């Protein structure tokens, strides 16, 4: 299965990101969609599993939970918005990682792309950075990878300039 991972769209889902994700089978969104229209636009584009972020309202929280625990082709994925990274996990994230023991932990919030293997919990921590234009980040980013028979492979990063003016 071909997986796309994005976060922190903050009402912005443009052609650069769509082109990067055009061949994926599933989009995972690690929170801060920005509004329900953006969540629906992504869901109309590709099958979507998401979690709500700290900037998402009740309309998004009605459809996207605080955490997602998924099994995709033998890989257990735990996803939440505010998570941190190895050695600096949020307290709730550490509790959930310890309880669920995922192969992949996905989070967003920081707007900083990080892919780090956690030797303590034996899991890959992925933060795809921010796909939107709101925030302090300098570039917009997304990640995609394949999962086949319990193995992750061919991980790629998409990176685009941060736009000041929203495209329609």
What are these regions, as identified by a protein language model?
Residues 1, 79-80, 94, 155:
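Detector for methionine-enriched segments
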Residues 1-48, 56-66, 71-79, 138-141, ...:
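N-terminal active-site segment of His-dependent metallophosphoesterases
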Residues 11-15, 33-38, 55-60, 84-89, ...:
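Active-site environment of divalent metal-dependent phosphoester hydrolases
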Residues 49, 88-151, 155:
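Conserved beta-sheet core of the metallophosphoesterase superfamily
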Residues 154-167:
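Short, solvent-exposed aromatic-acidic interface loops
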């Amino acid at each position: 299965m071909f997986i796309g991972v994005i976060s922190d769209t903050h009402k912005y889902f443009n052609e650069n990101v769509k082109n990067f994700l055009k061949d994926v089978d599933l989009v995972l969104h690690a929170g801060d969609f920005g509004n329900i229209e953006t969540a629906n636009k992504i869901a109309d584009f590709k099958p979507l599993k998401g979690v709500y972020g700290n900037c998402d309202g009740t309309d998004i929280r009605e459809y996207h939970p605080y955490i997602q625990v998924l099994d995709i082709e033998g890989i257990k994925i735990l996803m939440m918005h505010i998570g941190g990274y190895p050695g600096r996990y949020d307290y709730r994230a550490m509790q959930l990682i310890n309880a669920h023991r995922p192969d992949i932990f996905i989070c967003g919030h920081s707007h900083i792309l990080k892919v780090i293997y956690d030797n303590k919990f034996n899991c890959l921590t992925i933060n795809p950075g921010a796909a939107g234009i709101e925030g302090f980040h300098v570039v917009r980013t997304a990640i995609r990878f394949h999962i086949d028979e319990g193995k992750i492979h061919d991980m790629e990063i998409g990176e685009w300039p941060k736009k000041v003016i929203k495209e329609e």
